[in-house]
Amino acid sequence: MIALGIDPGSRRCGYGVVAREGTRLVVVASGVLAPRAERPVAERLARILDGLAEVIRRAGPAECSIEQVFSGASVRSALVLGQARGVALAAAAQAGLPVFEYAPSEVKLAFTGSGRATKDQMIRTAHMLLGATPGLSDEADALALAVCHLARRAGRLAVPAVRNVAVSVPGVAGRARPLALPPARERAALAAARLRPSRRDHRGLA
């Protein structure tokens, strides 16, 4: 199974595509879509939509995961995030991908073993667990979303080895190295695996 994680934003949108092959996790593609900041919001969102559509077309994920909206954001931040989330949901819907939502703490728990992981810890875990080297937390968060969803789907997460596959997105390289998942993190993944999706969208392309 191949899962797409999206960390939406109007200035930067992280994406991570991870495949589960038996007991292996494979980073198919990951990166950050970052339109020029001086462009109008509508144009930035349109470019992100096009970029996500291209990622989906090339990487071929079966399902999509995204973070739930948290209530601590300011009104302005919530409005901007809502616009970016709408673009991410639209990209998934256009490709016929079901969308699953997870709370930020649930994603962090499944990925790092701690529901309060910092941005730096998320980036380090992406390198340790997947061999990826995300330059920004947006990319690490997107990879974490994909891994969290795969954990929930599998019911457990054991990773004796990871490797790359041929599918890629221009300008993005996924790297991996063998790594066994510690028991504590596997228990965290099992907890995340019991989560249920709060949103699904089954619309496909016309």
From Swiss-Prot:
Binds 2 Mg(2+) ion per subunit. InterPro entries: RNaseH-like_sf, RNaseH_sf, X-over_junc_endoDNase_RuvC. Keywords: Cytoplasm, DNA damage, DNA recombination, DNA repair, DNA-binding, Endonuclease, Hydrolase, Magnesium, Metal-binding, Nuclease. Its main location: cytoplasm. SUPFAM superfamilies: Ribonuclease H-like. The active site is at residues 7, 67, 138. Mg(2+) 2 binds at residue 67. Mg(2+) 1 binds at residues 7, 138. Pfam families: RuvC. One of its GO terms (cellular component) is Holliday junction resolvase complex. It is an enzyme of class 3 (hydrolase). Its cofactor is Mg(2+). Its EC number is 3.1.21.10. One of its GO terms (biological process) is DNA recombination. The RuvA-RuvB-RuvC complex processes Holliday junction (HJ) DNA during genetic recombination and DNA repair. Endonuclease that resolves HJ intermediates. Cleaves cruciform DNA by making single-stranded nicks across the HJ at symmetrical positions within the homologous arms, yielding a 5'-phosphate and a 3'-hydroxyl group; requires a central core of homology in the junction. The consensus cleavage sequence is 5'-(A/T)TT(C/G)-3'. Cleavage occurs on the 3'-side of the TT dinucleotide at the point of strand exchange. Belongs to the RuvC family. Homodimer which binds Holliday junction (HJ) DNA. The HJ becomes 2-fold symmetrical on binding to RuvC with unstacked arms; it has a different conformation from HJ DNA in complex with RuvA. In the full resolvosome a probable DNA-RuvA(4)-RuvB(12)-RuvC(2) complex forms which resolves the HJ. This is Crossover junction endodeoxyribonuclease RuvC. It comes from Anaeromyxobacter sp. (strain Fw109-5). The lineage of its organism: Bacteria, Pseudomonadati, Myxococcota, Myxococcia, Myxococcales.
